[in-house]
């Protein structure tokens, strides 16, 4: 997949906001002194009167966005995942989640692919934190096309939404016009020996891994599970029944994220062997994104190794 066009989903987020802003006057965007990094600066240029910079005060930003949502506006509150899910968790829980307000959170720079910024900014806990909030939708797109469709779906959804976008450029695997639905996964490649359920930048790695596994006689199914909550239970159960083995792959801690959601479902409804690929019980490090992904086992090579051992 090295020859495919690559785009960072944070860029997709900024572009999608501009397009939606042209169509909907009630869309407003908030940032916390990071408009350049979150790419909401493109919206600022297009609609300066509908962009609000709250400074380095993420908790305040969440509360202001919550207040504005009660007037009929649809706020998109944007900052790094570490600050959106970490620093402002109390405000997200109590000011958005508890009253079930129509606020969308665009969290960029999630996972260890943040790179040189290091462990303090590499949020690998956000899915887990946001999943615990009742009524919160939690999503992570695989590429540019899905990210833009996801932002549109989030706008149309009534209620709180958390979306994670990445800093690193990822291959575009979807065709234009892709029909994204909240709570629905998609099978990108059919297989019968093992099902790899991934999201975010690990989807492209899973597809590459499946190609390599096929050369060795292992037919891997690849599922893009962009919505972590609500999980597409029907698709997970169908894959478990068909393949009998599941691998989850995510740029997140193995605690609290996609892997845990899949395991919780299967343990109750269809006990199935599962291998979780993600960040183990440790913090990240500073370094180039590609090197970090390999070091933490978040690569096609490691998915291949895990699948081969699993399918023995």
PLM ranges: what are they?
Residues 1-164, 169, ...:
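Thiamine diphosphate
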């Amino acid at each position: 997949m090295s020859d495919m066009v690559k785009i960072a989903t944070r860029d997709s987020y900024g572009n999608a906001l501009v397009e939606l802003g042209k169509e909907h006057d009630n869309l407003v965007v908030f940032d916390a002194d990071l408009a350049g990094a979150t790419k909401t600066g493109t919206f600022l240029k297009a609609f300066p009167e509908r962009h609000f910079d709250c400074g380095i005060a993420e908790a305040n930003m969440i509360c202001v966005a919550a207040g504005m949502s009660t007037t009929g506006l649809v706020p998109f509150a944007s900052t790094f995942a570490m600050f959106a899910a970490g620093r402002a968790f109390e405000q997200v829980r109590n000011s958005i989640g508890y009253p079930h307000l129509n606020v969308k959170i665009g969290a960029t720079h999630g996972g260890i692919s943040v790179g040189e910024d290091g462990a303090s900014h590499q949020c690998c806990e956000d899915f887990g934190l946001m999943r615990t909030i009742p009524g919160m939708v939690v999503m992570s797109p695989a590429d540019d096309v899905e990210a833009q469709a996801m932002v549109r779906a989030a706008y149309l959804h009534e209620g709180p939404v958390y979306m994670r976008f990445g800093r690193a450029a990822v291959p575009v695997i979807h065709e234009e016009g892709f029909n994204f639905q909240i709570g629905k996964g998609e099978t990108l490649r059919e297989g019968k020996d093992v099902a790899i359920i991934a999201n975010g930048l690990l989807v492209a790695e899973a597809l590459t891994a499946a190609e390599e596994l096929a050369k060795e006689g292992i037919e891997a199914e690849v599922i893009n599970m962009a919505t972590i909550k609500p999980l597409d239970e029907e698709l997970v159960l169908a894959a478990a029944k068909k393949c009998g083995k599941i691998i989850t792959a995510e740029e997140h801690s193995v605690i609290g994220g996609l892997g845990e959601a899949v395991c919780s479902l299967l343990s109750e409804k269809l006990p199935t062997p599962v291998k979780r690929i993600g960040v183990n019980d440790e913090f990240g490090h500073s370094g180039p994104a590609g090197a970090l992904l390999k070091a933490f086992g978040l690569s096609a090579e490691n998915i291949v190794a895990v699948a081969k051992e699993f399918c023995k």
